[in-house]
Amino acid sequence: MNFHIVKRENCPLWKKCCFYLGAVAIALLLGAALLSALGVDPVAYYTRMFTMGTIGNKIAYKVWINYLKDFVPLALTSVALSLAFKMRFWNIGGEGQFILGAIAAAFVAFKAGPVMPAAVTLLLMCAAAMVVAGLYGLFVAALKVKFGTNETLMTLMLNYIALYILIFISEDKGEWNFFLDPESLRPVFASFAEIVAFPSIPMAGKFSLNICVILTALVGVLVYIYLKFTKQGYEIAVVGDSAGTARYAGMKVNAIVLRTVFLSAALIGLAAAFKAGTAGILSTSITNDVGWTGIIVAWLSQLNTAVIFVVSALICVLHYGSTVAAATFSQVDSSFANMLQGVILFLVLAADFYTRFRVVMDKKGGNGNGNG
C-alpha cells in the first residue's frame, strides 16, 4: 500500500474556508486544553481575551483606541511586505525599516515641529520616514540585482544595524542627542507629543478615531488597486511567477524589483511615522515586533490585501486581549497569545497544504489515480 501526494486541480472556496476555520478551531481547542491544565476556565478566558475586557467596562472606548494604535502599524506593515513577497523578494527587514522610519519621523518632529504648522510637520514626518525606510530597502534590492546577493540574509542583518542605531541613540547623553530628555539624569527619550501629533476625529460618545486609521485603510485600497488594475501591478505578478518569462516579454525586471522594494520599504516607513506620530515618543520597543508579525500576517492572508486587514485585526485581538486577560487570570502569562498564534500559523499552513494537494492511497500494483 503506497501513499502519493497529488496536486489538486482546484479547491472550491467553501472547502478552503472549512480547512482554514477547522485549523483555527483545532488551535483554540489545544489552547483550551492547556488552559484547563492550568486550572483556568477556557470559556471565561477566551471571552475575556476576544472581547478585550470591553463588556461592562465604562472605559471601553479607551480599549478600542489603544487597540487601533496596535492595529494600524501591523496592518500597514503587512500590506507593505506583501508587495515584495508577491514578487518573491523576501523582505525580512521590516523591523529595521520601521526603526529607521520612526527615527526619521522623530527627527522631523523635533526640528520642524516648533517652527512649522502641525499639518506641514506631519506631512514632512511621513515623507522623511518613507524616504529613509525606502532607501534602506532599496540598498538591499540594488545589491540583489547587481550582485545577486541573498535578500533574506541582507535584510535580516540590516535589522540589527537599525536596532543598534536606535539603542545607541537611547543611551548616548551627548549634547548632539536632542532625542533624549535634557532634564533627565539618566537617558530617557524626550516626548514630542506636545509639539506635533496626528489628530483624532470625535465619534460616538467619548470614542475618537485617529486619522491614521483612515489613512491606513486608504493606503490599503490604493495598494489593492495598484496590484489589480495597473501595469505596474501586473509586472509584479509576472516577475513573481517567473523572472525569465518577464525578461522574455521585454519587461525591465531589475527596474521592477528596485521600484517595488522601495515602495514596500517606504510604506513600512509610513507605518513607522504613524506609530511615532501617535505615540509622540521614540522607544527601543517602538516596533512592537510588527516587522516579524507582519510576515506571519502576510502569509496567513496569502498576500491578499483585503484579507490582511482581517487577519491583522484578529492578531491584534490575540495580543491585546491576552494582555487584558492576563490581568484577570494570573495563572496565564500574556505571552499565551504568542503560543496560540504559533499554533494557529502551523495548523493554517497545514490546512493550506491540503487546499493545494491531496493524499491518495494506492494498493500494491495500483495505477496511482485513486481519489483522496
Predicted feature locations:
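Cytosolic-side transmembrane-helix boundaries in multi-pass membrane proteins
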Residues: M1-V24, D241, Y248-A255, S322-G372
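Short loop segments and helix-boundary regions at transmembrane helix junctions
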Residues: N10-C18, F85-G93, V115-A119, L123, ...
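N-terminal signal-anchor transmembrane alpha helix
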Residues: W14-D41
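Single transmembrane alpha-helix segments in multi-pass membrane proteins
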Residues: A33-S36, T51-K111, C126, M130-T149, ...
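Short, non-helical or kinked segments that cap or interrupt transmembrane helices
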Residues: G39-A44, F85-A102, V145-M154, E235, ...
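Transmembrane helix-bundle core of multi-pass membrane transporters
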Residues: N159-F229, F336, K363, N367
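Helix-loop-helix "hairpin" substructures at the membrane interface of multi-pass membrane proteins
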Residues: G205-I281, T305-A306
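Transmembrane alpha-helical segments in multi-pass inner-membrane proteins
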Residues: F262-G342
